[in-house]
Curated annotation (Swiss-Prot):
Annotated source species: Homo sapiens (Human)
Primary localisation category: nucleus
GO biological process assignments: positive regulation of transcription elongation by RNA polymerase II; positive regulation of transcription initiation by RNA polymerase II; RNA polymerase II preinitiation complex assembly
Signal peptide per UniProt: none
UniProt-listed InterPro entries: Mediator_Med18 (IPR019095)
Modified residues annotated as Phosphoserine in this record: 66
Gene that encodes it: MED18
Location in the cell: Nucleus
Entry protein name: Mediator of RNA polymerase II transcription subunit 18
Origin: domain of life: Eukaryota
Family: Belongs to the Mediator complex subunit 18 family.
Protein role: Component of the Mediator complex, a coactivator involved in the regulated transcription of nearly all RNA polymerase II-dependent genes. Mediator functions as a bridge to convey information from gene-specific regulatory proteins to the basal RNA polymerase II transcription machinery. Mediator is recruited to promoters by direct interactions with regulatory proteins and serves as a scaffold for the assembly of a functional preinitiation complex with RNA polymerase II and the general transcription factors.
Subunit structure: Component of the Mediator complex, which is composed of MED1, MED4, MED6, MED7, MED8, MED9, MED10, MED11, MED12, MED13, MED13L, MED14, MED15, MED16, MED17, MED18, MED19, MED20, MED21, MED22, MED23, MED24, MED25, MED26, MED27, MED29, MED30, MED31, CCNC, CDK8 and CDC2L6/CDK11. The MED12, MED13, CCNC and CDK8 subunits form a distinct module termed the CDK8 module. Mediator containing the CDK8 module is less active than Mediator lacking this module in supporting transcriptional activation.
Amino acid sequence: MEAPPVTMMPVTGGTINMMEYLLQGSVLDHSLESLIHRLRGLCDNMEPETFLDHEMVFLLKGQQASPFVLRARRSMDRAGAPWHLRYLGQPEMGDKNRHALVRNCVDIATSENLTDFLMEMGFRMDHEFVAKGHLFRKGIMKIMVYKIFRILVPGNTDSTEALSLSYLVELSVVAPAGQDMVSDDMKNFAEQLKPLVHLEKIDPKRLM
């Protein structure tokens, strides 16, 4: 899967603080084709991408109460594609008028020895999974419809089983901090997917 699009804003010094705006939902297996058909009609005039990714979640425990989390992901169906290292910050849930969950996001392409490097840095792998699905685009919005597979034998991505009888649906935008108006566009797009799927601003802490 590709990295999020890079902003075209000029950088005069330092780095741009990028944020991920996110809405999430799910759809049962038997409703998948109807949702795919709807997305084909609503999204940009191009064939949706398919992806098959292996993701590993690494933790680094320190003095702080909660561990530092990094995600390493690689494509299993695109030979030569780089590994991606991703950091997702704590969600900003305070603004009730904001229609999407917002969190700091850093996503970079790396060399293939990423996991060895993380282990040398003191991280340990917490869990891993395979994600398989479809990727649609609508302007700067990215819509992912995918199923998560549990890896039965650690490190063996050929030995998996589906985690549930549904597909996750994620609508996201990666943009510089302060561009909260994108959440309005996301809400309007999400409304067009009802009643097939209800995309919501979900606090991950509610799922713990």
